């Protein structure tokens, strides 16, 4: 009996030990290196401090070195969050979109871009993206180039010609917003344009604000501004439906017509699903306008700032643009083939995008538990990548603070190291649109002007995207005929 008791006891001890060890090993794979910091606050203070000083890549590098790991945990915006670093991490996130991870946005996005059926903006984003290819892919952008050029020529005539000095930031915002509204909504009426433009910046600012909805806060102002914009767009949709029914508008004339027709078709084909409404279309249009607004504005502004700081680069861009202009008849508008010849100009823009990424990066959420780097990322955890980490990393871009457009000549950077537009299925659907608009702007301004900064040492502030603190006032120096 005693020996049986001893055997049973040993078996229990062995099984218990195995259970404890296996549990510990399991936890070891779940518990990522890193810390989540204070409750609710987490490590948000350090993250945003580095973001505002333009060194948010150091937030990643410090922890990567501290934990000797390519993956670590933290807590930002009150969320448990994993960082997958380097090109390998970028590739993993991009290639597993809609498999292991899916898009996630902070709650501020849902508050600004509100849907009628209370579904989150990220839950709807995939549906919206299905509607975009006919209008934002390369084959469609080909037809926009001449319109972009025509609109910009008129903008320059209205706001640049005859002026000795201009402030770049507000002029770039005015042009890019007016162009987007023209192409997406066919809006040209100055009254409608002003009704959309006036509250737009507050709505865009609310997206990236701390989500505290008290009167007077940036977030609260953003919500109210978005409501005003959606009301204006709602009126445009109502009139467009009438025009479509009377044959005064066509389903293919712009993004709005296409979305109306496509949404109506899907509602009819899926009667058991809550139908999308005109309010949803309005929110989707608002989201698209906001989505591309800062990317293009930031890049154009810093191209302008950079070219004045590097005269040799300016001279090479001017030479390239003059060669293109010389190949065209007087008054002839730019076309898609012309943009393909602007190789050095685009290398310059890419180097600006590398040094001044016009985004803080992107967020994902784990759809299921998955393994990465020997650790398990739990379902529901958020993931974050920032382009700054690879784009300003000397391992991938030697002497990373040096402005050097030649980095993008030939084969260019290694895969997944230059990611200003994301990658994989979530590649920014407007990247070709942004490329075209940036190059058309460079062509028109550089052919007409050189310039000098009125504030030579104007600081760059980041809130949370980079911008010249005083709006980049410049003195225009027209080229001699």
Curated annotation (Swiss-Prot):
What InterPro entries is this protein classified in?
Cyt_P450, Cyt_P450_CS, Cyt_P450_E_grp-I, Cyt_P450_sf
GO cellular component entries: membrane
| Cofactor or coenzyme needed | heme
Per the record, the domain of life is: Eukaryota
* Source species: Platycodon grandiflorus
| Molecular function per GO | heme binding; iron ion binding; monooxygenase activity; oxidoreductase activity, acting on paired donors, with incorporation or reduction of molecular oxygen
Please state the Enzyme Commission number of this protein: 1.14.14.63
Q: List locations, semicolon-separated.
A: Membrane
Q: TM spans, by residue?
A: 4-24
Kindly provide the name given to this protein in its UniProt entry: Beta-amyrin 16-beta-monooxygenase
- Which is an annotated Pfam family here? p450
Q: Which gene produces this protein?
A: CYP716A141
């Amino acid at each position: 009996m005693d020996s049986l008791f001893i055997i049973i006891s040993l078996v229990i001890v062995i099984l218990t030990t195995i259970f404890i060890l296996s549990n510990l090993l399991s936890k070891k794979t779940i518990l990522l290196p890193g810390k989540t910091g204070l409750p609710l606050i987490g490590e948000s203070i350090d993250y945003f401090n580095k973001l505002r000083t333009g060194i948010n890549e150091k937030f990643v590098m410090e922890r990567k070195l501290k934990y000797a790991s390519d993956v670590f945990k933290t807590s930002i915006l009150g969320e448990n969050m994993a960082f997958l670093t380097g090109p390998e991490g970028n590739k993993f996130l991009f290639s597993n979109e809609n498999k292991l991870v899916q898009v996630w946005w902070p709650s501020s996005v849902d508050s600004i871009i509100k849907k009628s059926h209370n579904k989150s903006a990220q839950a709807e984003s995939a549906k919206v993206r299905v509607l975009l290819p006919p209008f934002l892919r390369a084959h469609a952008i080909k037809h926009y180039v001449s319109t972009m050029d025509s609109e910009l020529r008129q903008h320059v005539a209205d706001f640049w010609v005859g002026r000795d000095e201009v402030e770049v930031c507000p002029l770039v915002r005015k042009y890019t917003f007016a162009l987007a509204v023209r192409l997406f909504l066919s809006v040209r009426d100055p009254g409608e344009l002003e009704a959309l433009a006036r509250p737009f910046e507050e709505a865009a600012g609310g997206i990236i604000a701390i989500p505290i909805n008290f009167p007077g806060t940036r977030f609260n102002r953003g919500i109210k501004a978005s409501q005003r914009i959606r009301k204006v767009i709602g009126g445009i949709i109502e009139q467009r439906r009438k025009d479509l029914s009377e044959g005064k508008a066509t389903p293919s004339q712009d993004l709005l017509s296409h979305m109306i027709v496509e949404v109506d078709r899907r509602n009819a084909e899926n009667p058991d699903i809550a139908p999308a409404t005109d309010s949803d279309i309005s929110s989707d249009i608002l989201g698209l306008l906001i989505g591309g607004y800062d990317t293009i504005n930031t890049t154009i502004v810093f191209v302008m700032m950079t070219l004045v700081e590097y005269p040799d680069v300016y001279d090479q861009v001017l030479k390239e643009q003059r060669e293109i202009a010389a190949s065209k008849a007087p008054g002839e508008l730019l076309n898609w083939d012309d943009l393909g010849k602007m190789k050095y100009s685009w290398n310059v823009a890419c180097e600006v995008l590398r040094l001044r990424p016009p985004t803080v990066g992107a967020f994902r959420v784990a759809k299921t538990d998955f393994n990465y780097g020997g650790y398990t990322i739990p379902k529901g955890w958020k993931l974050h990548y920032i382009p700054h980490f690879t784009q300003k990393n000397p391992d991938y871009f030697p002497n990373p603070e040096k402005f050097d457009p030649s980095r993008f000549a030939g084969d260019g950077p290694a895969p997944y190291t230059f990611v200003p537009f994301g990658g994989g299925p979530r590649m920014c659907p407007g990247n070709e649109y942004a490329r075209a608009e940036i190059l058309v702007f460079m062509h028109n301004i550089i052919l007409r002007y050189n310039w000098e900064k009125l504030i030579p040492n104007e600081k760059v502030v980041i809130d949370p995207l980079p911008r010249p603190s005083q709006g980049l006032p410049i003195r225009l120096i027209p080229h001699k005929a």
